[in-house]
């Protein structure tokens, strides 16, 4: 919702979150911005936190700042693309220890320009974390980054990406950014309100991913937070000639909700 509806006439946080609530959203993903925390509380939205850091001395302060605005689950983009696994492991261990001491649940995001920017680096970190702690690494999954790294196509999204069901089922935060093998974000609509062929190609993967998570979380009360993440023009994810990313995010939310209801109805 950055620069929404335009850079010159950007809405206040309160108005943005009121619109999110009206559109059916249950939560807001945000950095530790006090105004967002207050608006989220006003509109009854769960706060999911965020920060990016590769410096262990910053972790406690960042976690506390996120806790202060109401976040319990906190997404962390950890370190840099040239951070090697031994250093990344040390940082992840400290991050989780700091989070536990504060009663928080941080999770390491799979993201470019971090220590998890490729599947190989991400799974090496997860393997090392499991070896040291005996526990699965808490992860925020964003498969759009892995898809472009591996140059995938709709026919092999699930085969190539859903290779660690235990880590997927352990996770509670997912970024459902529609993608293909060339673009980490594709438009959801064609500018006239119709779903794009590219989104339709991606939706079966979204269903396979949700099914995978549900298969490991039957008869539990664990929460799942799915963000239909459509980045704005300001961040470079969206392009100026494509439909507005926030309006597209609303459409993606509806499509994901349809899939969720289909899968959970089958379980009963």
Model region roles, listed by residue range:
Residues 15-19, 35-38, 42, 61-68, ...:
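Alpha-helical scaffolding segments of alpha/beta enzyme cores, especially the outer helices
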Residues 5-10, 25-38, 51-60, 80-87, ...:
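Acidic-and-aromatic substrate-binding clefts and catalytic sites of carbohydrate-active enzymes
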């Amino acid at each position: 919702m950055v620069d929404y509806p335009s850079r010159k006439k950007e809405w206040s946080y309160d108005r943005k979150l009121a619109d999110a609530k009206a559109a059916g959203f249950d939560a807001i993903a945000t950095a530790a911005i006090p105004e967002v925390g207050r608006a989220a509380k006003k509109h009854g939205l769960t706060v999911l936190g965020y920060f990016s850091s590769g410096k262990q001395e910053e972790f406690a302060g960042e976690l506390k700042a996120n806790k202060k605005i109401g976040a319990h689950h906190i997404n962390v983009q950890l370190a840099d693309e040239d951070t090697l696994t031994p250093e990344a492991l040390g940082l992840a261990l400290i991050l989780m220890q700091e989070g536990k001491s504060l009663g928080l649940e941080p999770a390491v995001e799979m993201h470019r320009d971090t220590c998890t920017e490729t599947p190989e680096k991400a799974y090496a970190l997860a393997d090392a974390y499991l070896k040291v702690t005996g526990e699965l690494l808490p992860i925020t999954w964003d498969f759009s980054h892995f898809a472009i790294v591996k140059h995938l196509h709709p026919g092999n999204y699930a085969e190539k990406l859903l290779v660690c069901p235990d880590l997927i089922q352990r996770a509670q935060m997912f970024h459902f950014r529609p993608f293909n093998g060339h673009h980490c974000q594709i438009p959801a609509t064609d500018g006239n309100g119709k779903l794009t062929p590219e989104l339709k190609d991606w939706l079966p993967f979204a269903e396979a991913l949700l099914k995978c998570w549900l298969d490991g979380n039957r008869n539990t009360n664990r929460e799942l937070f799915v963000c239909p993440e459509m980045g704005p023009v300001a961040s470079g994810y969206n392009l100026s000639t494509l439909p507005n990313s926030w309006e597209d995010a609303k459409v993606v939310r509806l499509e994901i909700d349809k899939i969720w209801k289909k899968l959970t109805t089958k379980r009963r």
